[in-house]
């Protein structure tokens, strides 16, 4: 058993509270920056590092705006329609991965058109470092005591709140499978140059969708939504088109190979 006593505030700077949740995004982009520099030396995609640097700002906008709008629309629309100012309070949590994914894909689409580069190449590059952000983001969710798991009697159960039951650390499950494992698999494909026959972005969609769908069975559904039907949550529903889309294009190789 683990008693959760972590503080969501990392530190304060001149009365400004810096949250672990915000830092997870910051370090996600920083680590991705250096990781992309590494994998581009493996001839992974026909894109220069300068192009990726130019895209970073677009990626930040896509993730933040898409993630927030996705959460508002998919998970708590009525609340935010009644309290629109709350939409701006991103530091309190409330981001949707699926919304962030759509936001980033749109950013990639418009950026690739502007720079006249191949959309799929940039999508594969971004997909290769997405697990880094997922890993850090899920750890931040754990610190924030959000997206908590369902009750469990296991030895690794977590007591998130006083007078509550032990719960699955579903955020840690997601950090391991959606973050660490997908990262290792994609890195292996890049190092072995299997990307000439396997589309990395499609593989990411399939693996993430499968892991997220499975782990949702150990995670409490959003209290204001509950299950959409039977024991299926909104997150699981949103994973289905991801997997189907990934299966459609998994054999489409990178341009130039």
Labelled PLM ranges:
Residues 1-257:
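A feature for loop-to-transmembrane-helix boundaries and adjacent hydrophobic helices
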């Amino acid at each position: 058993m683990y008693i959760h006593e972590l503080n969501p505030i990392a530190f304060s700077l001149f009365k400004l509270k810096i949250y672990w949740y915000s830092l997870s995004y910051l370090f996600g982009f920083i680590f991705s920056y250096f990781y992309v520099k590494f994998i581009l030396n493996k001839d992974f995609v026909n894109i220069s590092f300068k192009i990726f640097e130019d895209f970073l700002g677009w990626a930040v906008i896509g993730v933040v705006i898409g993630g927030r709008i996705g959460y508002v629309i998919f998970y708590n629309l009525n609340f935010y329609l009644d309290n629109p100012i709350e939409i701006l309070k991103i530091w309190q949590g409330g981001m949707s991965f699926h919304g962030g994914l759509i936001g980033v894909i749109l950013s990639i689409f418009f950026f690739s058109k502007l720079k006249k580069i191949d959309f799929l190449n940039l999508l594969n590059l971004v997909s290769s470092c997405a697990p880094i952000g997922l890993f850090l983001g899920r750890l931040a969710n754990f610190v924030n005591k959000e997206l908590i798991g369902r009750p469990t009697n296991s030895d690794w159960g977590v007591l998130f709140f006083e007078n509550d039951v032990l719960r699955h650390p579903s955020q840690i499950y997601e950090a391991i499978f959606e973050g660490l494992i997908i990262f290792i698999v994609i890195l292996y494909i890049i190092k072995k140059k299997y990307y000439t026959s396997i589309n990395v972005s499609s593989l990411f969609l399939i693996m993430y969708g499968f892991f997220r769908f499975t782990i949702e069975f150990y995670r409490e559904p959003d209290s204001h939504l509950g299950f959409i039907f039977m024991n299926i949550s909104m997150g699981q529903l949103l994973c289905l088109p991801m997997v189907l889309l990934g299966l459609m294009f998994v054999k489409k190789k990178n341009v130039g190979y």
